[in-house]
From Swiss-Prot:
Family: Belongs to the transaldolase family. Type 1 subfamily.
Function as written in the Swiss-Prot or TrEMBL entry: Transaldolase is important for the balance of metabolites in the pentose-phosphate pathway.
PROSITE patterns: TRANSALDOLASE_1 (PS01054), TRANSALDOLASE_2 (PS00958)
Protein encoded by which gene: tal
The protein, known as: Transaldolase
Species the sequence originates in: Pseudomonas aeruginosa (strain UCBPP-PA14)
SUPFAM superfamilies linked to this entry: Aldolase
Length: 307
């Protein structure tokens, strides 16, 4: 029998959630995603020492530019061993500034262009704030495709689809974490709140003819992945990808298009109200932005203090 990983690939595009080049080369995903936390881990790997040196040398003391140059260098390496796309993230500290997000996205695309990488192989990752979604809407009109991340609520998914973004990354595991702690109980299978969130979004998109790709992210266990077999894409850590590669047994498609809610359009006040009413999404979005910003600052410090 084929492994669960090979079976999953029959229904779902498998994406590696890592900046570890060697893991990607071994596990052969179609696409890869990075973020400031993963880049900080990658910076500790010996294979990236030269990229760190070059990123610093070419940035004129601008630590933010050095981070972007390092992210693009890692992305270029990864694109050499995958057939698809790399997702590279905008500085999370710009999450509430549409204009600054646009400027940083344009810079990332220019840096990839300097490396001979076509924009068709790059997704710009942006936090799913109201301001981030508005920036993504403009980028999509410019032909720059986006990946809206830190997505925890149905309201965020509705706004992203209405804006015509290329892809969203709803966070399964972090939703699960919040409910497990808040309700003081564990969840498994179809009862998992993170699984339920992605399933609801997926069916809403399919029922209403949205082209936006749903890519489940942030998994805590194989059960969550198995429940979402059939989702457009799943971005999975190397550890869980390896567990899938080693696992035998049936892996049926459990997520299928079905009845979805009627099409909605949210203006800014309705979006903010629905977010305000969702304690989990409000807390996890704020926490996610803080964590990515902190790791961005750590990476900038590391680059600024290199000798």
């Amino acid at each position: 029998m084929t492994s669960k990983l090979e079976q999953l690939k029959q229904y779902t595009t498998v994406v590696a959630d890592t900046g570890d080049f060697d893991a990607i080369a071994r596990l052969k995903p179609v696409d890869a995603t990075t973020n400031p936390s993963l880049l900080l881990k990658a910076a500790a790997l010996p294979r990236y020492a030269e990229h760190l040196r070059q990123a610093t040398a070419g940035s004129g003391g601008d630590a933010g530019l050095a981070c972007d140059r390092f992210a693009v260098a890692v992305g270029k390496d990864i694109l050499g061993v995958i057939p698809g796309r790399i997702s590279t993230e905008v500085d999370a500290r710009l999450s509430f500034d549409s204009e600054a997000t646009l400027a940083r996205a344009h810079r990332l695309i220019e840096l990839y262009d300097e490396q001979g990488i076509d924009r068709e192989r790059v997704l710009i990752k942006i936090a799913s704030t109201w301001e981030g979604i508005r920036a993504a809407e403009i980028l999509e009109r410019e032909g720059i495709q986006t990946n809206l991340t830190l997505l925890f609520s149905f309201a965020q998914a509705v706004a992203c689809a209405d804006a015509g973004v290329f892809l969203i990354s709803p966070f399964v595991g972090r939703i699960y974490d919040w409910y497990k702690k808040s309700e003081n109980r564990d969840y498994a299978g179809a009862e998992d709140p993170g699984v339920q969130s992605v399933s609801r979004i997926y069916r809403y998109y399919k029922a209403n003819g949205y082209k936006t790709v749903v890519m489940g992210a942030s998994f805590r266990n194989l059960g969550q992945i198995e429940q979402l077999a059939g989702c457009d894409r799943l971005t999975i850590s190397p550890d869980l990808l390896q567990q899938l590669a080693d696992a035998q047994g049936e892996l049926p498609r459990l997520l299928l298009p079905g009845e979805g809610e009627p099409r909605q359009v949210l203006d800014e006040s309705a979006f903010r109200w629905q977010m305000n009413e969702d304690a989990m999404a409000t807390e996890k979005l704020a926490e996610g932005i803080r964590l990515f910003a902190r790791d961005q600052e750590k990476l900038e410090y590391q680059l600024a203090t290199r000798h």
